[in-house]
Amino acid sequence: MNRKVLDELRWDDGYAIPVANAENKTLEEEMQKKEKEKIQLSNQVKGFEERIQAMADHLRNVRQELTYTQSLVRARENETESEEHFKTLSEREIGRLKQEIQRLENELVSLREKKNSHENNIFKTTQKLENLKRQLNWDQQTLEAWLEESARKDEDSMAIQKYSQKDDGKIKELSLLIEKLTLEAGQKRKLMDNELTETITAQIELDKTAEDFRKAHTERQQLISQWESTIGQMQKRDRDIDHCAMLLAQVKQELREKESIIKEKIQFLQSEIDNNKEYEKKISAAERQAAKLRLELQEQEIIRGRLQDELDSLKGVVDRTASDLETMRTEVTSLKKDIRNRQNRLQMAQEYNDGLSDKLNFVTESALSLEERALRMEEMFKEQEKTVKDLEVQLKQIREILFKKSQELHECKAKEKDVIAEINGGQVTLKNLNSQLQKLDSHALKQQGIMYNQDFQIQQLERRLSRLKGEVNTDEKQALEMRVSQLTKVFEERRAALKLLNTQHKKLQGDVRYIKRELEKTGQEKGDLISKKEEFNLFNMMSEKTLKKIKASKQDLMVEDNILKLEIKRLRDMLYSKADDVFSLEKRKLQLQTAMKERTEEISVHKEMLKSHIRYVDQERQNISSQLHERLAKVEKMRKRFEILTIAMMPPEGEEEKSQAYYVVKAAQEKEELQRVGDDLDGKIRKAEKEIRALENTLRVINGCNTSFKKSFSKITETSEEYDEKVQLEEEKKAAEEKHRYKQRQIRELQEDTQVMKNTFDSMINEELSYQEKAKELLPAITQLNKETEDQKQKLERVLKQYSKLSKHVRNAKKSKEETQEEKDINVRDLRDFNQSLNKMLAQAMEKNPDLATALQLYFHQFGLEIPTIGSTPGSYSSRSSSSRSSTISVRSGTSRISVNSGQSPRIKVVDLGLPPACPSSNVSSARSSRTSSRSGSSKSQKQE
């Protein structure tokens, strides 16, 4: 390899081959140490960044957990405040009820006292009546005596009648007072009954409100417990995530350490391989000097036969790999079919989501009540749960299939690795054997040449001797001819064997080329399979992420749905209670209206009856009074007639007079008869008056009921309790309407949010499909670019090798160890071209993506640079004089073209433009580091070759 490079450079054999001196070796060792330190530091930086990321995630989770706990604490505080509020309300209600009970007890005591006083008054009046009756119930003798005295003194009798009439009036007044007191007692009893019914209804309402409060309290506690359980689950998940993040960081750290160890081992292996190559060269040089070439030729022929057998076996292995490749292709086709099926399922799921969105739009457009919307939401939620379950089942099936396929792919990879290892081993052995064969052939040819030369020299010397002696021996001549013929036969046989070996060698080379082509094909197919596997992994990751998002949104929707259900249940209970109250009030109103109508009809009928009865009673009273007057007139007439008769019936003088007692008795009998008739009439009059009073009382009661009923329909004053109750009910109604409107607004907002989420999900799916199509379209371009990059890398390696050799040559010529002025000029021009190409790329990116302009302006202004534009970036590909400069510029332009083309692709564009703009010094250092890395890579490739 070194000889080829020196031949390309036209190196003179008179000069020694340049070797790195001690300083360069120390510099290379220091560079290797620095690279190791750099790798270790980069691994540490990555580990610290991952730890910082894990700590940030942990801090975010802790903050979220803190917010959840604070919301729980607030909920608990609100619950305690509401419980204290209800406790104070219940205490106030208990105090009010105690006061009401005390007031009712006081009223009962006062009513009992009044009742006792009224009973005492009634008892006293009854005693007075009995006394009067006793006074009136005189015996017959006192009556006769009184009649005698009354006959004597009519004035006294008239006075007694007056007093008796007064007593009768007092008795009537007392009886009326008793009736009035009894009526008042009945009214008080009615009021007491009304108060009792009101207190019972209030107690029932209080019990009902207490039950509602208990239900709400239990529901609230259940909701808080559910919330706590969900928060506990979320905390557990956060802890698991933190643990997994820590494990991931540890695994990454171990992986980086292992990678560094592997790199060191690879470097050590490379150095050992180089040493082995040197030793092999020495061994081959020693083997060239070995004797017994014929035995070695025979051994090589045996080895060649064995190699032929191995080649046949390798051909069989290649056939097996081809069959395995065919099976893998069939598996790839089956995987493509699975992808199509999954796409069809995804399309079906999208159609199902569209159907669900149509249902949601239909639900939102239709003017449904809260209950119907809640039922629709529940149905939709159940359907969505079914779809999610079906998707989960499908995902499980797909995962199982993917796991099986990945296992099969892993097995195929293992088989492929084994086959590649066998092929590589066979190629290595084949190369070694070919090299040994070539060496032996060359050595044998050299030995044959030496032998032929020696034989020829011997023959010439013998001829000379024979000529000098003058002897010509025919036997010797024949022997020589025989030997010449034998040697020619041997030469022909050797030539035929050489031809056969050359043909077999050509066949082996053809077979090796065929195996290499097959290996390249299998490598390409392996790369395709790996890319497809990565695509499947990405698809699975995206599907898992979408599934996680759907699960999270589903959990959020479940929580919101449960909250809405609870709120709807509470509103429904309130609505039912209010509806029951309204229904009971309406029912009571209807009952009152019907009762009022019936009562008005009864009152009107009763009024008519009372009026007719009053008219009848007035007529009877008038008749009785007229009869009384007539009777009094008759009595007066009879008295006058009696006087006239007494005067007329006075016996004449001489006849004995009838005794006075006779007339007194007769008058008393008539008076008694008249008294009895008068008593009967007085009894009838009293009875009629009592009936009239009773009717008046009933009329008064009816009028009172009518006035109270009219008052109930009259406007309520602001100072009354009913007005306060009305205001409170109106406020509750307004609050309920506000809550209803707020819940409707929340439902509309939730529906809008769900619609927005569906739209974003559809847009994300469309974007994903577009990105997949773009990726598929860009795959051939990427492969082409990769090929171009490989070609450019090879060119770059060659140019860098030439550049390093020329720079060493120039430095040796100038006898300087530092960079020359020409090298600095070349580096400056390279950096300028690189900067111009980078500015051009940034300007093109800003033209394609105007959103990046603001971020780039910020970065450029921070470092005091101007924003690049396409007009301001001159052409970076000017002509150069020297061939080395043109080659470096072509490499740079190739790399810039690669970067620009990669900037056109979405992925590499984001990676390139996501970096902050670097200052010139950083660009210089990056260019130098890339140059040094390329130099080291080229040196390694030289060693390997």
Swiss-Prot record:
GO biological process: axonemal dynein complex assembly; cilium-dependent cell motility; epithelial cilium movement involved in determination of left/right asymmetry; inner dynein arm assembly
Biased composition range(s): Low complexity: 871-899, 921-945
GO (cellular component) term, any one: extracellular region
InterPro entries: CCDC39
Coiled coil: 16-535, 584-604, 666-826
Domain of life, per lineage: Eukaryota
Pfam families to which the protein is assigned, alphabetical: CCDC39
Alphabetic keyword roster: Cell projection, Cilium, Coiled coil, Cytoplasm, Cytoskeleton
UniProt-annotated stretches for the region Disordered: 871-945
UniProt key word Flavoprotein: no
Subcellular location per the Swiss-Prot or TrEMBL entry: Cytoplasm, Cytoskeleton, Cilium axoneme
Protein task: Required for assembly of dynein regulatory complex (DRC) and inner dynein arm (IDA) complexes, which are responsible for ciliary beat regulation, thereby playing a central role in motility in cilia and flagella. Probably acts together with ccdc40 to form a molecular ruler that determines the 96 nanometer (nm) repeat length and arrangements of components in cilia and flagella. Not required for outer dynein arm complexes assembly.
Family membership: Belongs to the CCDC39 family.
Protein name: Coiled-coil domain-containing protein 39
Species assigned in the record: Xenopus tropicalis
Source species taxonomy: Eukaryota, Metazoa, Chordata, Craniata, Vertebrata
